[in-house]
Amino acid sequence: MRKGVLKDPEIADLFYKDDPEELFIGLHEIGHGSFGAVYFATNAHTSEVVAIKKMSYSGKQTHEKWQDILKEVKFLRQLKHPNTIEYKGCYLKEHTAWLVMEYCLGSASDLLEVHKKPLQEVEIAAITHGALHGLAYLHSHALIHRDIKAGNILLTEPGQVKLADFGSASMASPANSFVGTPYWMAPEVILAMDEGQYDGKVDIWSLGITCIELAERKPPLFNMNAMSALYHIAQNDSPTLQSNEWTDSFRRFVDYCLQKIPQERPTSAELLRHDFVRRDRPLRVLIDLIQRTKDAVRELDNLQYRKMKKILFQETRNGPLNESQEDEEDSEHGTSLNREMDSLGSNHSIPSMSVSTGSQSSSVNSMQEVMDESSSELVMMHDDESTINSSSSVVHKKDHVFIRDEAGHGDPRPEPRPTQSVQSQALHYRNRERFATIKSASLVTRQIHEHEQENELREQMSGYKRMRRQHQKQLIALENKLKAEMDEHRLKLQKEVETHANNSSIELEKLAKKQVAIIEKEAKVAAADEKKFQQQILAQQKKDLTTFLESQKKQYKICKEKIKEEMNEDHSTPKKEKQERISKHKENLQHTQAEEEAHLLTQQRLYYDKNCRFFKRKIMIKRHEVEQQNIREELNKKRTQKEMEHAMLIRHDESTRELEYRQLHTLQKLRMDLIRLQHQTELENQLEYNKRRERELHRKHVMELRQQPKNLKAMEMQIKKQFQDTCKVQTKQYKALKNHQLEVTPKNEHKTILKTLKDEQTRKLAILAEQYEQSINEMMASQALRLDEAQEAECQALRLQLQQEMELLNAYQSKIKMQTEAQHERELQKLEQRVSLRRAHLEQKIEEELAALQKERSERIKNLLERQEREIETFDMESLRMGFGNLVTLDFPKEDYR
C-alpha cells in the first residue's frame, strides 16, 4: 500500500480529513530540524494559535518516515497532562503530515541563546520540577521520552513547562533502540544493542545532563565530535557541575540523576521528593524569566531593525553613511543593549561563551559544533507576501516571519522606496512585534541556515543511527526466526511424544482386550472341560453301577442256585421250612446287595463331588496362572513403552541441545558480524571526520595565507603612517630649531647653521628610513613566523585532538568487543547450565518413572498373588467344610478330564 493512502480504518482514524492549507492560515516558520519545519499558524475557524510540525514522508526511507509519523501521532494522542505538549490533531497533505500542537513561546535552550549566560539555580529548579512532573506521568504509563534536553523543554506564556518532541519516544518499557541526541544519551542507550534493554531511567540521565546544560550553557563534551562523545559517555565516569558556586542540593541532584548504573539511578517520582525541586522559590520565577527574555528578544530585533534602516538610507542616498557616524550610532545602540543584557538573567560569574545549542526538535541538529555568533548577526528575510500564502502545498523554506502582539516601532519620517529584498528585511523586524516569543529572529534564521547547509556530521550521525536500528532489526528478525524454529521443533517433539503416548495407550488397550478375550476363552474352555469331566465321571459311574448291578444279579443267581442245591441236598428239612429259609436268604441277599448298591452310589457321589471340586481348584489355579501371565505381559509392555519413551526423550533432549547450541552460535555470529560492521563504520566515520577537520583547517590556513598580504599591507601602511607622522614631527622640530638658531646666531653664521641643520635633518631622516625599512622587515618576518607558528600549533592541536578521539574510539570498540565476548561467554555458560540442569531433571524423571513403574509392578503382582492366595484359601476352607480334606494331593482317575 502506498503510504498516505489510508485503507486501514485504524490508521485512518489517526488523521483528520480537513485540508490543512485551508484550515490554518498565516503560517510562519519558527523552527527547523532534520524532520522538517515548525510553523506558527492560526486556525481559520476558531482563531486559535497553534504550532504545526510538518513532516514529509516521501523520498528516501519512505516506509521508516511513515512509521515514525504513525508512532508519534499514536504517542501524542494518549498524552493528557499539564506538563506535556497538548496535541490538537494531524492532517495529511501531499505526502506531508501536519502535526498540530499547542503554541509555546520557545524552549529552555532559547533562554540560553538569548541571554548568553547560564540560568539562575532557582530558574533551573523550576524548569526541572515541571519537566519531572511530565516524566513521572510518562513513566507511570510505561512510556519513555528518550530525547530530554533543553531544546525539548518548552515554556508557555503563563510559565508552564511542557515536554515536547516525542519523535524518539518509546511506547514500551523496557526498550532497546539506539535513539536520542548523542550528548544527552544515557550510557545504557548507547550500549542498548550490545548489552540489553533500558527503561525510563534513561530520561533521568538526560535530565541530569540538561541541568548541566542550563547551568553551563552547553552539555558536557559539547566541544567534542558527537561520535566521540558517544564513546566517551559509554566508558568514562559521569559528568559533574564544574563551577563551585552552585549549592550542594543542586550538585547532589545532578549527581543523583547521573548515576552510571541504572539500578542506582532514581525514578522520576523519587526525584520529585528531592530538596532541590521542593525548596521554596518565587511563584513568578518562570514568568519573570520569560518576560525578561521577551524584552531582550525585542531589543535584539530592534537592533537588527535599525541596522536594516541604515542599509535602506544608504541605498536611498546612493552612498554609505559616514564611517564615524555609523560607528557612533552602533556604539550607542550596542551600549544600550549591553546595559540591558547586564541587567538580565543570572548573576553567576561563569564566563559567557557563545554556544548555540538551538531548540530544534530534532535529536540530530543538537550535534552542531559551537557556532560563531557573528555569523548570524545579520539576518536576511523575505516579506509577508511569500509567507502568508497558505494555499500553496509547500511553504517556502524561508517563510519565517514573526508577528508580535505589541505595536511595532514606527518612524514618522517618510522613507524612500528601497529595493525589494532590503525592504523585506526591514519589514520583517517590524512584523515580528505582533506575537510573543522568546526566540530571536537571528536564532530562527541560523537554524534554517544550518539545516539548509550540507551538514556532513548530521548525515553521518543519521546514517549511524539508521545502521544501529537496522542491526537491531536484523537481530530481532533472527531472534524471531530462531524462536519460531525452536517453537516448531518443540511442537514437533511434543507431537512425537503425544503420538507415542497415544500409540502406547492404544497398544495397552489392545493388550487389555486381548487378555480379556483370552480369559473369556479360557473360562469357556474351562466350563466345557468341567462339563465334559462331569459327564465322563457320571458315564463311568453309570457304567460301574451297571456292571455292579449285573454282578449282583449274577451273584444273586449263583447264591440262589447254591441255596437251592443245598436245600435240595438236605432232605431232612421240610419243604415249607426250606421255602422260608430260601426266602429269608433271598431277603438277606437282596438287602446286602441293596446296601452295597447304596454304598456304591454314595461312594460315586462323593467321588464325583470331590473330583469336581478338585477340577474347579485346578481351573482356578490355571486362571490364576493366566492372570499372572497377563499382568506380567502388561507390566512388561508398560516397561518397554516407558523405556522407548525415555529413549525418545533423551533423543529429543540431545536434538534440542544441538539446536540450542546451533542457534546461539548463529545469533552470536550475527552479533559479532554486526559489531564488526558497526566498528568498521565507526572507524570510517572517524577517519572521514578527521579528513574533514584537516581539510577545514587547511582551507582556513590557505585563507589566512591569502589574507596575509592584505594584513601585511595594512600593517605596512600603519608603519608608513607612523613614519610619516614622525617625519612631520621632525620637520616641525627642524623648522622650530632652525628659526630658534637663526634668531640666536649672527647672520653671517646662518649659512653654516642651515647647512649643519640640513645635514642633521638628512641624517635623522636616513635613520628613520632605516628604522622604517627595518620595522617593515621585522614586521614581515614576525607576522610570517607568527602565522607559521600559529598554524603549526593549530595543526599540532588538531592532530592531538584527533589522535585522542581515535584512541577513545579504539578503547570504546575494545570495550564493546570485550563486553560482547563476555556476554557471549555468559550466554554459553547459561545455556550449558540450562542444558545440564534439563538433562539432570530428565534423568531424575526417568529414574523416578522407572522406580514408580517397578513399584507399581511389585504392588500389582503382590496384590494379585495375595488375592489369588486368599481365593485359594477360601476355596480350600470351603472344601474342608464340605469334608473333602486336602485336595492338593488328590489323584485323578486314569482319564484326564482337564
From Swiss-Prot:
Domain Protein kinase as annotated: residue spans: 24-277
Pfam families noted in UniProt: Pkinase (PF00069)
GO MF term list: ATP binding; protein kinase inhibitor activity; protein serine kinase activity; protein serine/threonine kinase activity; transferase activity
PROSITE patterns recorded: PROTEIN_KINASE_ATP, PROTEIN_KINASE_DOM, PROTEIN_KINASE_ST
Primary localisation category: cytoplasm
Record: residues binding ATP: I30, G31, H32, G33, S34, F35, G36, A37, V38, K53
Broad EC category: transferase
GO cellular component: cytoplasm; lipid droplet; plasma membrane
Name listed for the protein in its UniProt record: Serine/threonine-protein kinase TAO3
Source species: Homo sapiens
Lineage of origin: Eukaryota, Metazoa, Chordata, Craniata, Vertebrata
Gene it is expressed from: TAOK3
